[in-house]
């Protein structure tokens, strides 16, 4: 895991397996089926990294031989909240890693000015919960910021929110950091820039279209 000195709340997950799978996802010739499988696999690997610092406690366990105080995750419960629609493709990998997690959904699309328009919010109970928001891309950053706003308006502290994405543009990361410096952003790659259509360069195209086999 590395950091960029410009963005103190950005963490780049540079594990070789993550980078290998991301390269295949970038390839325009990768099929919808393979793209979907890779998204699940890479999200599982990234989920392993971002849950590294979960608080721990111990629980008395009887092994076949002795009783021990065994380490278990403490207190707070986990919730996975994909940002629709492309974020749905990431929830499977996270649920494979954390099958007991609750799942919410935040529906946001970008209007012609690339601003977020909210159309759905469904969340589990918020008390004593750690939230993992997920969306494959942080381009302008506005959708990510809006999704975090949804949780914070309901009383969730920034320290209890993480945002997981595959690729991000520096412009979007700056918007994210300015709005929510207390929320950690985890990505597989910090890409070069946004083009005139607000697409990440080099990016991986429209993640939702590639995931579901649709055309924009």
UniProtKB/Swiss-Prot annotation:
<keyword id="KW-0328">Glycosyltransferase</keyword>
<dbReference type="GO" id="GO:0000287">
    <property type="term" value="F:magnesium ion binding"/>
</dbReference>
<dbReference type="GO" id="GO:0004845">
    <property type="term" value="F:uracil phosphoribosyltransferase activity"/>
</dbReference>
<dbReference type="Pfam" id="PF14681">
    <property type="entry name" value="UPRTase"/>
</dbReference>
<protein>
    <recommendedName>
        <fullName>Uracil phosphoribosyltransferase</fullName>
        <ecNumber>2.4.2.9</ecNumber>
    </recommendedName>
</protein>
<feature type="binding site">
    <location>
        <position position="110"/>
    </location>
    <ligand>
        <name>5-phospho-alpha-D-ribose 1-diphosphate</name>
    </ligand>
</feature>
<keyword id="KW-0460">Magnesium</keyword>
<comment type="function">
    <text>Catalyzes the conversion of uracil and 5-phospho-alpha-D-ribose 1-diphosphate (PRPP) to UMP and diphosphate.</text>
</comment>
<dbReference type="InterPro" id="IPR034332">
    <property type="entry name" value="Upp_B"/>
</dbReference>
<dbReference type="InterPro" id="IPR005765">
    <property type="entry name" value="Ura_phspho_trans"/>
</dbReference>
<dbReference type="InterPro" id="IPR029057">
    <property type="entry name" value="PRTase-like"/>
</dbReference>
<dbReference type="GO" id="GO:0044206">
    <property type="term" value="P:UMP salvage"/>
</dbReference>
<feature type="binding site">
    <location>
        <position position="85"/>
    </location>
    <ligand>
        <name>5-phospho-alpha-D-ribose 1-diphosphate</name>
    </ligand>
</feature>
<feature type="binding site">
    <location>
        <begin position="205"/>
        <end position="207"/>
    </location>
    <ligand>
        <name>uracil</name>
    </ligand>
</feature>
<comment type="pathway">
    <text>Pyrimidine metabolism; UMP biosynthesis via salvage pathway; UMP from uracil: step 1/1.</text>
</comment>
<keyword id="KW-0342">GTP-binding</keyword>
<dbReference type="InterPro" id="IPR000836">
    <property type="entry name" value="PRibTrfase_dom"/>
</dbReference>
<dbReference type="GO" id="GO:0005525">
    <property type="term" value="F:GTP binding"/>
</dbReference>
<keyword id="KW-0547">Nucleotide-binding</keyword>
<comment type="similarity">
    <text>Belongs to the UPRTase family.</text>
</comment>
<feature type="binding site">
    <location>
        <position position="200"/>
    </location>
    <ligand>
        <name>uracil</name>
    </ligand>
</feature>
<keyword id="KW-0808">Transferase</keyword>
<dbReference type="GO" id="GO:0006223">
    <property type="term" value="P:uracil salvage"/>
</dbReference>
<keyword id="KW-0021">Allosteric enzyme</keyword>
<feature type="binding site">
    <location>
        <begin position="135"/>
        <end position="143"/>
    </location>
    <ligand>
        <name>5-phospho-alpha-D-ribose 1-diphosphate</name>
    </ligand>
</feature>
<dbReference type="InterPro" id="IPR050054">
    <property type="entry name" value="UPRTase/APRTase"/>
</dbReference>
<feature type="binding site">
    <location>
        <position position="206"/>
    </location>
    <ligand>
        <name>5-phospho-alpha-D-ribose 1-diphosphate</name>
    </ligand>
</feature>
């Amino acid at each position: 895991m590395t950091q960029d000195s410009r963005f103190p709340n950005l963490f780049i997950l540079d594990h070789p397996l993550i980078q290998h799978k991301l390269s295949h996802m970038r390839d325009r010739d990768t099929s919808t089926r393979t793209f979907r499988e890779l998204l699940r696999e890479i999200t599982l690997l990234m989920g392993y990294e971002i849950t590294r610092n979960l608080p721990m406690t111990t629980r008395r366990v009887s092994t076949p031989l002795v009783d021990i105080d065994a380490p278990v995750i403490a207190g707070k419960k986990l919730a996975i909240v994909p940002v629709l629609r492309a974020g749905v493709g990431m929830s499977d990998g996270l649920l494979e890693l954390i099958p007991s997690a609750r799942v919410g959904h935040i529906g946001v699309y970008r209007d012609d000015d690339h601003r977020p328009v909210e159309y759905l919010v469904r969340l589990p109970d918020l008390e004593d919960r750690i939230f993992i928001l997920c969306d494959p891309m942080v381009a302008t950053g506005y959708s990510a910021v809006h999704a975090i706003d949804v949780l914070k308006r309901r009383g969730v502290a920034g320290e209890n929110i993480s945002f997981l994405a595959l690729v991000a543009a520096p412009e979007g990361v700056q918007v994210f950091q300015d709005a929510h410096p207390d929320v950690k952003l985890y990505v597989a790659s910090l890409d070069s820039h946004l083009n005139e259509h607000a697409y990440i360069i080099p990016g991986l195209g429209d993640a939702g279209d590639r995931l579901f086999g649709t055309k924009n």
